[in-house]
From Swiss-Prot:
Name of the protein described by the UniProt record: Proteasome subunit beta 1
Signal sequence range: none
Principal cellular location given in the protein's record: cytoplasm
Gene behind this protein: psmB1
Catalytic activity, reaction form: Cleavage of peptide bonds with very broad specificity
Role of this protein: Component of the proteasome core, a large protease complex with broad specificity involved in protein degradation.
Active site (UniProt): 7
Domain of life, per lineage: Archaea
Length: 197
C-alpha cells in the first residue's frame, strides 16, 4: 500500500500576534482516515507547532520540546523564546539527518515578540512573516502572497489563514475537511478554535 499522506498548515505573523491554521483531515493512501485530527500542538502557553508528515515523529518532537521548555524555565526562571525553541528544534532535526524525522514543521509563538519559523526534516530554518507546509503548500502560499500585508490585524490574518487552507483543500486531494483548526497566539495567551467551512 502506498502510504502517501498530506495536509496543509499555515502560519502568519502580524504585529499583535501569530495565527496558525491547519485542515483536520488525516489521509492514508487515497483514503480519508478521519476528518477530526488536530494538527496544531501547543508546546507551552505561548508556543505551538503545526504538523505535516509522520504523526509518530511529530509526537516525539512535541514531547522533546515540551520537556526542553520546562527545563529551560526551571533553569533560567523565564520562558524559552520562540526563536530559541526554533533554533533548538533545528539542531535536533539536523543531528538526526541520517535517520531524519519525516516532518515539516511551522513553529509559532509570542514570548517576547510574534515569531513564525518553518523547519524542514534536515533542520533547515527560515523565519518569515508567513509560511505553509504540506502537500497543499503551493495553493496556500499563492493566497498568502496575494493577501499578506504587514499591517494586518489578528482577525484579518485569521481570515487569510482560513482562506489559504480552504484554497488548498479545493485543489489538493490530501488536504480537506469541513473545518479548519485555528490557533491564535497573542501576548495575552493562546486560543484554539475550529471554524466550519
Amino acid at each position: 500500500m502506498n502510504r502517501k499522506t498530506g495536509t496543509t498548515t499555515v502560519g502568519i505573523k502580524v504585529k499583535d500576534g501569530v495565527i496558525l491554521a491547519a485542515d483536520t483531515q488525516a489521509s492514508l493512501d487515497h483514503m480519508v482516515e478521519t476528518l477530526n485530527i488536530r494538527k496544531i500542538i501547543p508546546i507551552t502557553d505561548r508556543i505551538a507547532i503545526t504538523t505535516a508528515g509522520s504523526v509518530g515523529d511529530v509526537q516525539m518532537i512535541a514531547r522533546i520540546l515540551e520537556a526542553e521548555a520546562r527545563y529551560y524555565y526551571f533553569a533560567w526562571g523565564r520562558p524559552m523564546t520562540t526563536k530559541a525553541m526554533a533554533n533548538l528544534l533545528s539542531n535536533i532535526l539536523n543531528e538526526n539527518k541520517w535517520f531524519p524525522y519525516l516532518v515539516q514543521i511551522i513553529i509559532g509563538g509570542y514570548v517576547d515578540e510574534p515569531t513564525i519559523a518553518n523547519l524542514d526534516p534536515y533542520g533547515g530554518l527560515i523565519f518569515d512573516n508567513y509560511t505553509a507546509t504540506g502537500s497543499g503548500t503551493p495553493f496556500a502560499i499563492a493566497i498568502l502572497e496575494e493577501g499578506y500585508k504587514e499591517n494586518l490585524g489578528i482577525e484579518e490574518a485569521k481570515e487569510l489563514a482560513i482562506k489559504a487552507i480552504k484554497a488548498a483543500g479545493s485543489r489538493d486531494v490530501y488536504t480537506g475537511s469541513k473545518k479548519v483548526q485555528v490557533v491564535t497566539i497573542t501576548k495575552e495567551g493562546m486560543q484554539e478554535e475550529f471554524i466550519k467551512l
